[in-house]
Design a protein with these regions (language model features):
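N-terminal strand-loop-strand beta-hairpin
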Residues: 1-122, 154-180
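Short amphipathic alpha-helical segments with coiled-coil-like heptad repeat character
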Residues: 16, 143-146
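Proline-centric
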Residues: 131-133
Length: 180
């Protein structure tokens, strides 16, 4: 089971970040529109979840299911267990989830540009009606801070909590229905 350690960097200049990553020698991954549906039991209580389950579809027809454990906040980053695997037929899995008593409670769409550099993964995410942000995944909080300095982002605002809280608390938008 993999652990992710990540932080979100807010208030970024998207073109400047892309340029800096390419100058460092980062590998750019093709851009995608992601469509994400979240599932849980009907009696879920927001903020009390012990795990999260989603089906994510990429614009290139790749689909995956992800189970995530509740995150631990590590200063400016967060850590959580995560299991991902590819699925060929997301509609059938969605039907299966509903048959075993789960319900779809949220839907998002976002555009993503990703890069890989050494041991880091970078995702520039753009949701509708809000500024883009950069998510950095690394081996530790210090590892993430190291690359923030390389990118000259160490003075930017960071966010360690989940995207739902970011979207609802900072941008006052409905995370449950983020559609283009």
């Amino acid at each position: 089971m993999a652990h992710e350690i990540e932080t979100k960097v807010l208030d970024i200049d998207v073109e400047k970040v892309k340029k800096k990553l390419l100058e460092l020698g980062a590998e750019k991954i093709p851009e995608h529109r992601l469509v994400v549906d979240w599932y849980d039991f009907p009696n879920r209580k927001e903020g009390k979840e012990e795990w999260f389950l989603r089906i994510r579809s990429y614009s290139d027809e790749k689909h995956e299911v992800t189970w995530k454990a509740k995150s631990d906040i590590l200063g400016t980053a967060r850590k959580h267990k995560e299991i991902n695997f590819l699925i060929p037929e997301p509609e059938k899995l969605a039907d299966f989830f509903e048959e075993i008593g789960l319900e779809k409670y949220a839907h998002q769409e976002k555009d993503r540009t990703s890069f890989f550099y050494k041991d880091w993964q970078f995702d520039i995410d753009q949701y509708p009606n809000m500024p883009a942000f950069l998510e950095i995944e690394g081996n530790s909080e210090e590892h993430v801070k190291e690359v923030m300095k390389l990118l000259e982002l160490e003075n930017n605002r960071t966010w360690a909590k989940g995207e739902r809280i970011l979207i609802q608390e900072i941008y006052n938008l409905d995370w449950y229905k983020m559609k283009f």
